[in-house]
Amino acid sequence: VSRNAWIIFAVICAAVLGTLVFVARQNRIDVGDVNTNKIITASEANGNIADHVYGSDAGKTILVEYGDFQCPACRSAFPLLTLLKIEFKDDLTFIFRNSPLTQIHPNAKAAAAAAEAAGLQGKFWEMHDKLFEKQDEWASAAAEKRLSFFVSMAKEAGVKDIEKFKADIESKRVNDKITYDLALARKDGVNSTPTIFLDGKRIDSETWADTEKFKSMIQESINKHKKDDDKKAEKKADDKEKAK
């Protein structure tokens, strides 16, 4: 067996071992009591990085996307989800969680790390958008070349400290956040991306891909929550009046 063959074999073994360690780490995270239909706050378990939220932090209507930055279907869904999160930003809580499918998308976890690293400088959504907009440019990049793509996009996204950005990509903190998101995805039965939940209910792709139908569902949820809030306010006022 040639020396080069042994080197290739060693690299493959290292990659497989790394994947096994990563999966084992996910399986050790206990998210059994976590309510995935709400904003997950920062904790030691997720690297002290809270859920990334667009829109209202206090919205009663919760839209969660489990996404993979290298996934072509996620790229296709990106314009629609951008439209929805902007249109309903005053009433909708949009949450993005990482679910990189590393078996078929070798650059997905690195891209997730780049987004999280940008997030540590307040530029998660800007980097999120760049990764999807320029997916064709970096998706097939070799492992040793992808960092240069991420650095270029980070600069465009407004990330100021590039050395910190590069260090954060490799950090335990960012890795813990991605691993935690994957544990949440596993809890929610996610096996493909994008997987979308509205108020805790999984929405099939045919439904969310129908823009008008999905917009109608979101609006109905918003209206229902507002109606429920009005009823609670009326009851509180009545109880206060009776107590006089």
Predicted features along the sequence, with ranges:
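A generic local structural motif
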Residues: 47-52, 80-81, 182-183
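Ser/Thr/Pro/Gly-rich low-complexity linker/stalk segments immediately outside membranes or between
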Residues: 26-41
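Envelope-exposed proteins and targeting segments
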Residues: 59-62, 90, 192-194
